[in-house]
């Protein structure tokens, strides 16, 4: 049996196959929420051509339930993937420390800013920096420090 690899970020490494009634709003690049799960649609095909049923391939956005607390705005529920031992690279690309790196879904949080707060499992974290090159319009990587 081929097990999917262990997740290393907010995106599940295994693609999900979904069947749904035809709906013009279900298109590639959109999001689908069902039973507390969040999916980013990779493809949606009307495989019969009759506008009756869709075959959808999607990526599930997984993570721990958290709360994004932007400065001067109401809190928002979100999924957070935490990596407690991510290498922090200096300007030469050398790992100089290990810090907490997180990924959040932009559809749930919007563009997280430095200085904002994330809370996961009753633990609060400050957003201290962006993880360079990780914002792809779906997921944003950020560096965190635990609030003492």
What is each model feature region?
Residues 1-148:
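Short, conserved turn/kink motifs that form compact alpha/beta structural patches or helix kinks used as
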